[in-house]
Each structure stands twice: as C-alpha cells, then as structure tokens.
UniProtKB/Swiss-Prot annotation:
Name assigned to this protein: PF03932 family protein CutC
Keyword entries, A-Z: Cytoplasm
Natural source organism: Pectobacterium atrosepticum (strain SCRI 1043 / ATCC BAA-672) (Erwinia carotovora subsp. atroseptica)
NCBIfam families found in the cross-reference section: PRK11572.1
Similarity field: Belongs to the CutC family.
Any GO MF annotation of the entry: copper ion binding
Listed GO CC annotations: cytoplasm
Major place of residence: cytoplasm
Gene3D superfamilies, per the entry: Copper homeostasis (CutC) domain
Subcellular location: Cytoplasm
InterPro entries in UniProt: CutC-like (IPR005627), CutC-like_dom_sf (IPR036822)
C-alpha cells in the first residue's frame, strides 16, 4: 500500500491533511525557505490536535546543510524537545564541506533521536554521491530518505529514485518535490511506496487593508498577502489515486 505524507506549514493545514486521509504529516515552518523547524506553539498544537503520525522537520535555517557548532547544538536541542513531546519521528539531515553525509554529526543526531523514526531530508539531493550516501544512511539506521532523485522534481529524478528503491537494504525511499495527483501513478509503477506532497495551493490573505511599498522580506517581489495551504480535496484525491484498487490497475 502506498503511503502519502503531506508537508504542512501550519497546524491548521496539518488538521486538514489528517482529516482528508493523509497517512503522515511533515510539520514545518518557513515554506519559502524549503522548511524550517516549527515553533514550540506549533509543535504543541500538533500533538494536541492530530492523531496520525507527525514528523517535525528540524532545520535551523535555509540554505545549505553544512552546520557550524552553534547551529548543530540548536539542532540537537530541538530534536530533544521533539522527542520529549512524544513525536514518533523527526526529519533532519547534515552534510560536510565535501558534500558527503556528515557522519559524526549524524551519529550524534541518531543518538539524540533514539526511539524516533528518522527521515533524512532532501539534503540527500545535494550530496555528492547518492549511492554512498544510501549505504551510510543504512548503516546509521535511518528509517527513510526523502528525495527528488537529485533533480528539481521527483518526476525528473524518477530513474535514480527507482534505482535507490531497488538497492536499499533498509531506508524507505520516499519521493518528494513536485509529487501531485497527475503523476502519482508514475511513482507507483516505479515501485516507490511512499510519496511526499504539499497537496495545496496559494491562498489570499483575509486582510483588506494592504500597505503598499513596505515589505517584511528583502525580496520585495514576494507576495506577503498570500500563504500556501493544504487543499483537503487534493489530499483526498491523491489518497484515492494511490488506493490498493488503483495500484492493481497500474500493475495489470
């Protein structure tokens, strides 16, 4: 059975995804930066209101995945908090200066995250050698790897995703980036059994007064009066598309 993980940038979105049939939530902040560690308030809200598994991302900043000592300390503190709050899993990753898995840091992360399922996030798509990385993450005991097959979209990276799925002796390969209703069957046909999607759309802010010429972001072209929200209808449609009955249609 194909599982659908929905990437959510708020508790409200996570509630919508859960009610619409998602199998798991990746809880994030910072949509425009590709996902950052959610606040304590968001974490607490998710624990109180969502029954399906929620795996928060722990990522202290946008940009690359090579962390200094201060940033790495923050990562470990955040993982401790996530574990103590009772979350079943966490999404995290670290690379070294040469683009390989940062093994010393990842060993510490695995120790701190003991008892939780660890997903190595799309830092995997920025690493030098995905096959070596897969072996290293297998030895570390990582539960799954979120990847676009080292391409901008998972559909473009499907060949590598298929190869990694066939080669993996442990971690589940979960396809993410550009996974949508129109292409889920391609991943199923490739033997990929976990999919990651934001399953939503940009929605306009309810604010009627909108100050012109002032931005809270250095990129003044960004629309700050919109936010990305999960669409429950899209989640439901994707779940129907990956149902066992549909899977049999793709196989036959």
């Amino acid at each position: 059975m194909t599982k659908l993980e929905v990437c959510c940038y708020s508790v409200d979105c996570a509630i919508t995804a859960a009610q619409s049939g998602a199998d798991r939530i990746e809880l994030c902040a910072g949509q425009r930066e590709g996902g950052l560690t959610p606040s304590y308030g968001a974490l607490r809200g998710a624990r109180e209101k969502i029954a399906i598994p929620v795996h928060p991302i722990v990522r202290p900043r946008g940009g690359d995945f090579c962390y200094n000592a201060t940033e790495f300390a923050a990562i470990k503190y955040d993982i401790e908090q996530v574990r103590e709050m009772g979350f079943p899993g966490v999404v995290v990753g670290a690379l070294n200066e040469e683009g390989h898995i940062d093994l010393p840091k990842m060993r510490e992360i695995m120790a701190v995250a003991q008892g939780m399922a660890v997903t190595f996030h799309r830092a995997f798509d920025m690493c030098l050698n995905p096959y070596i990385a897969l072996e290293q993450l297998t030895d570390l005991g990582v539960s799954r790897i979120l990847s676009s097959g080292q391409q901008q979209t998972a559909e473009n990276g499907l060949r590598l995703l298929r190869e990694l799925t066939q080669a993996s002796r442990g971690p589940i390969i979960m396809a993410g980036s550009g996974v949508r209703l129109t292409n889920v069957h391609k991943f199923q046909q490739a033997g990929i059994r976990e999919l990651h999607s934001s399953a939503g759309q940009w929605t306009s802010s309810p604010m009627r007064y909108r100050k012109i010429g002032v931005s809270m972001c250095s990129d003044t072209e960004l629309d700050e009066f919109s936010q990305y929200c999960v669409d429950g209808d899209v989640v439901e449609a994707m779940k129907r598309a990956v149902s066992p009955d549909r899977e049999m249609q793709y196989v036959s």
